[in-house]
Structures are given as structure tokens and as C-alpha cells.
């Protein structure tokens, strides 16, 4: 049975009366300075809806009673600054539904707001969705982000061909072309959950944000024909192999799609090897070079 997000938020939230009736002074009497600081941040987030930021350290499934007197398994993201476990149920993690595997989010830096405090149980419940709503409102109505702005983005999850980042309260999924001028066969070799990036705003609306990490930098293909004339040789690093082509990266970031010289075979070369390539041609529509591998360093 699908759990209604609004109902879940209400049922997991600690009431103000219950919170104010808790004997925090007695419970916190023997805490260390670090423990006290951790709990004070949790209390403040609950009381004033201030944001907390920590790293997702794993997943946990907890029982959740339903109206039919049955228990349903509720999967939660887990964050922990020091000793207090904070559970974020998956329905309260996203603002919009996504197909992202929750395991891919482990290691990501996320913002959240505390909605429930179990002081005696040494844990708390939070909602990332509330933090996203707050950040989105601030970005649109206070910061007034617009097309062309460069903003900070945090990698939420990364797969071989798609990456999701969080910026200004939006979860934005992008393909390889929006990430790098250099061809990337597997983006997980360059990006990981929790990584901090800069991204350029391509368009923005009340419920959408389009970004490009690639456009923050300079396109290395511009004037590449002057730096790497046809017939010249250059050091390059093999970045991937695909359909008989060997994708190599020059020191300035240009991609060279190569063939091997006749004396070489494919099993002599691996991804990450440094090689000498000879520049053979320029492919403007792909914005890459063609070349031939002449040697291995």
C-alpha cells in the first residue's frame, strides 16, 4: 500500500506540546560538548525549521503501522553528524518522484529539516522535501536566480550515463553532454555522490531548473586546430574504448578518437594508459579530433 506523503509527514512529526513537555535539561545533563552541540542543532531545526546538512551514510527499513492494523516497511535514508541517528523516509526525501536507486545516494551531502524528535530513543526524523521547498522559494524569490548565473550544485547520485545534482532546491538530472566537453564513457569515473560542482543556469521556472556544468568552463575544441595541427603528435590519456574506437584525452581536455597503428593490438592498451597520438583530422560536428595511436609511454 502506498503511503500518502502528507499523512506520513503528520504521523511522524512530534507535536509542539510533546516537544515542550520533554525534560531536555535532565536528559542532556551528562552530554559531552560535541553531543550537546549535535542535539541543540536538532532542537533548533525542529523549533525554527532551520536547515541541517550532513552526509547520507546508508539505508534502513523501519516498521510503519497502517490503518488496517498492519505494519508496512518504510525505507529511510540515514544521516548522522556524530551519535544521533536521523531517519529520512524516502517519500519525504524527494519533492518530485524519481527513478533513482536509493543506494546511489549514499555518500551525498544533503539538507533537511527535523520534524520529529525522540530524545529518549536517541534519534530523530527529518524531511529533505521541506528543505528543498525552502531553498527553492529562497532561490526564486530572494536570490532571483536567472539564465546565465553560475551556482553551486552538489552531486546527489551518479550512474554511467546520467547524473543528478541538487541546486537551489531542485534535483536536476543531466546527461554526459551537459557535464563535460570531454567524452566520458562512464561518468562514475569522474563524478561521485557528495561532490561539489559549479553549474550555469540554462533556464529556470517555478518547478524546473536546467543546468550545464560543461558551460562553466571553456570549450577546449575552440582553436584546437591551432594548438594541435594535423600531422602533429601529442601526449594523451586513454579514457575509454567503444565500438573499435579508442577515446583519448589531450592535456588541454580535447577528445581524440583514435585507431591503433598496425604494429599494435587492443590488448596492449588499457584505460588510463598514457600514449602518443598523431593528429589526423578535426570533426566539427562532434567537436573532437581523429588520430592514430603511435606509441605507449
Task: State the predicted function of each range.
Residues 1-297:
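Single-stranded RNA-binding regions, centering on S1/OB-family and related RNA-binding modules
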Amino acid at each position: 500500500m502506498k503511503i500518502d506523503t502528507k499523512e506520513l509527514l503528520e504521523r511522524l512529526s512530534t507535536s509542539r506540546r510533546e516537544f515542550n513537555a520533554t525534560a531536555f535539561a535532565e536528559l542532556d545533563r551528562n552530554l559531552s560538548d560535541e553531543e550537546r552541540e549535535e542535539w541543540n542543532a536538532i532542537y533548533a531545526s525542529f523549533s525554527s525549521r532551520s536547515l541541517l546538512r550532513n552526509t547520507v551514510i546508508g539505508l534502513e527499513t523501519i516498521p510503519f503501522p497502517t490503518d488496517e492494523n498492519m505494519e508496512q516497511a518504510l525505507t529511510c535514508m540515514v544521516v548522522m553528524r556524530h551519535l544521533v541517528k536521523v531517519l529520512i523516509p524516502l517519500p519525504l526525501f524527494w519533492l518530485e518522484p524519481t527513478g533513482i536507486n536509493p543506494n546511489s545516494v549514499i555518500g551525498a551531502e544533503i539538507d533537511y529539516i527535523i520534524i520529529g524528535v525522540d530524545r529518549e530513543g536517541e534519534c530523530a526524523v527529518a524531511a529533505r522535501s521541506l528543505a528543498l521547498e525552502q531553498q527553492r522559494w529562497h532561490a526564486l524569490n530572494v536570490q532571483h536566480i536567472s539564465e546565465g548565473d553560475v551556482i553551486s550544485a552538489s552531486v546527489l547520485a551518479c550512474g554511467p550515463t546520467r547524473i543528478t545534482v541538487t541546486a537551489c532546491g531542485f534535483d536536476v538530472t543531466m546527461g554526459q553532454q551537459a557535464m563535460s566537453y570531454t567524452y566520458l564513457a562512464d561518468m562514475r569515473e569522474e563524478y561521485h555522490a557528495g561532490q561539489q560542482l559549479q553549474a550555469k543556469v540554462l533556464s529556470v521556472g517555478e518547478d524546473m531548473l536546467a543546468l550545464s556544468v560543461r558551460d562553466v568552463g571553456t570549450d577546449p575544441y575552440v582553436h584546437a586546430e591551432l594548438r594541435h595541427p594535423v600531422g602533429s603528435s601529442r601526449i594523451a590519456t586513454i579514457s575509454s574504448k567503444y565500438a573499435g574506437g579508442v577515446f583519448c584525452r589531450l592535456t588541454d581536455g580535447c577528445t581524440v578518437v583514435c585507431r591503433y597503428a598496425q604494429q599494435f593490438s587492443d590488448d596492449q592498451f588499457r584505460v588510463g594508459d598514457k600514449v602518443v597520438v598523431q593528429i589526423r583530422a578535426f570533426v566539427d560536428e562532434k567537436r573532437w579530433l581523429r588520430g592514430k595511436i603511435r606509441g605507449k609511454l
